[in-house]
From Swiss-Prot:
Species of origin: Arabidopsis thaliana
Gene that this sequence comes from: COG2
UniProt record, GO biological process: Golgi organization; protein transport; regulation of exocyst localization
InterPro entries the record matches: COG2, COG_complex_COG2_C, COG_su2_N
Listed name of the protein: Conserved oligomeric Golgi complex subunit 2
Oligomeric and partner information: Homodimer. Component of the conserved oligomeric Golgi complex which is composed of eight different subunits and is required for normal Golgi morphology and localization. Binds to COG3 and COG4. Interacts with FPP3/VETH1 and FPP2/VETH2; this interaction promotes the association between cortical microtubules and EXO70A1. Binds to SEC15B, and, possibly, with EXO70A1, SEC3A and SEC10A.
Length: 756
């Protein structure tokens, strides 16, 4: 076997011969030879050979079988070489394997029995251990419950004992009735003594101790619920709690009336210990805040001498601020002391603001009504200022956030219906502009009003400016609704732009004028000059001082917000500027319509030279002089010189002259075209007559044609027209329509040179 391994190289390392590359591989077989049949369970060698001998020679079959045998031998050798090490090791272990198995079986069975027995012992010990631990746990739980019950009993007894001590303390000598809240009737002489102050402080310290014990008692009760012992003690606990609340309330009121800082500290810590902050806040509200607020905010049904409503709150807030600074500041400072644990109290919201809200709702409910926008805004801003004053007593930003999140603060802000207020202001401002824009004609501002109108001329423009300014007036704008007023501002600008553009489009389409568009139908060119002037003034104001005023008012906002506002206002100014080209085009149309009235005389040129013997014309037609007269008169008029910019005047001049020239050229080209067609037809008729008559015509072909005379007349006219255009400051050669006109009527030798 070793020789076989040594002499048989691995298939992967054996060199391949040329036969492997250029001839059939070793394992290739003819189609009739199928080695897979040898593996069939029903294979019979004799029948297999007998079947093949009928069509395969015996030598060929033998050669193929030997070749297949050699291939199988090679595969067997490769298999042995691949797993030789494992094969040898396995052969050494297989010697007397049965006897070895018998010898190993007995120890293994013995070991299994020992392991099974040990496992049973361990499980029994584990079960016993678990039972012991469970019993210990149950005993510990029972001991804990017992200790809890004992502690509860001791605490209840201790609380009752301390409460019994309370009536015997010297501080109760000032009040015979333990259930009375009338601490204000105490003997001032005794309450100012040093011993009396010490007694109050001693009682407050004792109450703080009782509150601490009550806090422990609540903890015990929370961990021992539904136990009969606890249920039996509930009455005692409840009675102690009621007595504690009553005594603590008396002591707290006494401390408030006497401004005793130590007593207030102790009482507030006691309230915080028993988690009853609402009681302290309510006592402070009813005892200190409510009496004063009721004196300030009283029923008033008349109006003062100035005619203002008595629902105004500004004066009331001033008195309340003075009261807070004088009588409430001490308690507010105590409750906001750093690291005192008293931040759980919110006297600002639940005592002061709560009482103020209730008083306003009861006595002055009209203060919350947005039906009177001016009074509403005044009260709203006064209330915001009052809230800011209260927030000034908050020691930190988190305290301010907590104050704003209080339910009473949220309820207070809900009373101010800013949405309805804005709707009323919207109707007021937008209605004023809409009323001005629905006028059937342009309304001019009187001279006495021009100083306050930014040099505006039209009442419609002045109304727009006043409405825009009203949106951001101090007595109109609500900062929380600034986004809505910004939207209203943009809507006002858009409404004015639509008023101008829709009227101009209506005039252009010659449709029946809709409401607000009648003014454009009857307006003159000078009227449109006023509109252009006002639009330019409005754009300058909106994108200048007006935008600066808005940015200054919103200076507390973020940069992103200011950028959005600036872009929005600038876009509103752009919407106004977009109507300027429409206005300019309308003025051009008005001027052109006046100018082209003289072009009707152009048709007379045909009658002048048709079927006549007139010589070539040598001077221009009279109508040419009047073509540009409306343009010149308009641009040199006072309205254009005073209210139009140089750029606008240049646009009007160029646009008017170009349009007049275009119409002039179209009409002249039509006249020339008709004349040439007529001449061509007449010439054909003459030629036909000559052919029929056989004689020469009496008319010489060398004479100047009627069409040439017309073109010469038009050429003289266009030269004069060009001189008039030059007099206005334009170059005729720069006008495409003029160049086309020149080439249409100029003689052949002057087609390429325009000279006037």
């Amino acid at each position: 076997m070793s020789d076989l391994v040594a002499t048989s190289p691995s298939p992967s390392s054996a060199p391949r011969s040329a036969t492997d590359f250029f001839s059939d591989p070793y394992d290739s077989h003819p189609l009739w030879f199928k080695p897979s049949l040898f593996l069939s369970p029903n294979f019979d060698s004799e029948s297999y050979i007998s079947e093949l001998r009928t069509f395969v020679p015996f030598d060929t079959l033998r050669s193929e079988l030997r070749s297949h045998l050699a291939s199988l031998n090679r595969e067997l050798v490769d298999l042995i070489n691949r797993d030789y090490a494992d094969f040898v090791n396995l052969s050494t272990k297989l010697v007397d394997i049965d006897a070895a198995v018998v010898r190993m079986r007995a120890p293994l069975l013995e070991l299994r029995e020992k392991i099974t027995g040990f496992r049973g012992s361990v499980e029994a010990a584990l079960f016993a251990l678990r039972n012991g631990l469970q019993q210990r746990s149950d005993a510990a739980a029972a001991r804990e419950v017992l200790e809890l019950l004992l502690d509860t009993f001791h605490v209840v007894s201790k609380v009752e004992k301390l409460i019994k001590v309370l009536p015997s303390t010297p501080s109760d000598w000032q009040n015979e009735d333990a259930n009375s809240m009338g601490r204000s009737s105490m003997n001032d002489e005794n309450s100012t003594q040093q011993d009396g102050t010490t007694m109050r402080e001693t009682q407050s310290m004792l109450l703080e101790r009782i509150a601490s014990e009550m806090n422990r008692l609540k903890f015990y009760m929370a961990h021992a619920q539904n136990l009969p012992f606890i249920e039996n003690m509930e009455k005692r606990i409840q009675s102690a709690s009621v007595l504690l609340d009553a005594s603590l309330g008396h002591c707290f009121i006494d401390g408030l009336n006497n401004s005793d800082t130590s007593v207030l500290y102790n009482c507030l810590r006691a309230y915080a210990a028993i988690d009853n902050t609402n009681a302290a806040e309510e006592i402070f509200r009813t005892t200190i805040v409510a009496p004063f607020i009721q004196k300030i905010i009283t029923h008033e049904t008349t109006t003062n001498a100035a005619g203002t409503s008595e629902d105004e709150l500004e004066n009331d807030y001033k008195q309340i601020k003075h009261f807070i600074a004088k009588d409430c500041k001490m308690l507010l400072e105590i409750s906001s002391t750093d690291k005192s644990g008293l931040h759980v109290f919110d006297f600002l919201a639940n005592s002061i603001l709560k009482e103020v809200l209730w008083a306003i709702q009861k006595v002055k409910p009209g203060a919350f009504s947005p039906g009177r926008p001016t009074e509403f805004l005044k009260n709203y801003k006064a209330s915001l200022d009052f809230l800011a004053y209260l927030e000034g007593y908050c020691p930190s930003r988190s305290a301010v956030t907590k104050f704003r999140a209080e339910a009473i603060c949220v309820e207070f802000m809900k009373q101010w219906n800013v949405g309805v207020y804005f709707s009323l202001r919207f109707q007021e401002i937008a209605g004023a502009l809409d009323s001005a824009l629905t006028s059937p004609s342009l309304v001019f501002i009187q001279d006495s009003d021009k100083e306050s109108s930014l040099n505006l001329i039209l009442r419609q423009s002045d109304t727009l400016l006043e409405c825009l300014r009203s949106c951001w007036k101090e007595d109109v704008l609500v900062f929380s609704a600034a986004d809505k007023f910004l939207r209203l501002t943009l809507q006002l600008l858009s409404r004015y732009s639509f008023w101008v553009s829709s009227a101009l489009n209506n005039r252009k389409s010659n449709a029946s004028p809709s409401p607000g568009c009648e003014w454009a139908v009857s307006a003159t060119a000078e009227d449109f000059v006023y509109v252009i002037h006002d639009v330019n003034c409005l754009v300058s104001e909106v994108c200048g001082d007006y935008l600066g005023h808005i940015s200054q008012y919103l200076s507390s906002s973020s940069t992103e917000v200011l950028d959005v506002v600036r872009i929005s206002i600038e876009q509103g100014g752009v919407s106004l500027e977009k109507v300027l080209p429409l206005l300019t085009k309308t003025i051009i149309d008005v001027i052109v319509d006046k100018s082209v009235e003289d072009l009707r005389q152009l048709r007379g040129i045909t009658a002048t030279f048709r079927m006549t013997n007139k010589p070539l014309p040598v001077r221009h037609s009279p109508y040419v002089v009047g073509l540009l007269r409306p343009v010149k008169a308009f641009l040199e008029g006072d309205k254009a010189r005073n209210y139009l910019t140089q750029k606008t005047k240049e646009e009007l001049l160029h646009g008017s002259v170009s349009e007049i020239t275009r119409r002039y050229y179209e009409l002249a080209a039509d006249v020339v075209s008709v004349a040439r067609k007529t001449q061509s037809s007449l010439q054909k008729l003459r030629q036909n007559a000559q052919r029929r008559g056989g004689a020469a015509s009496g008319v010489s072909d060398q004479n100047v044609s009627e069409t040439d005379k017309m073109c010469m007349q038009l050429f003289l006219d266009i030269q004069e027209y060009g001189r008039n255009v030059s007099a206005l400051g334009l170059k005729p050669a720069d006008i495409p329509e003029y160049c086309s006109f020149w080439q249409c009527v100029a003689p052949a030798d002057r087609q390429n040179s325009i000279s006037v």
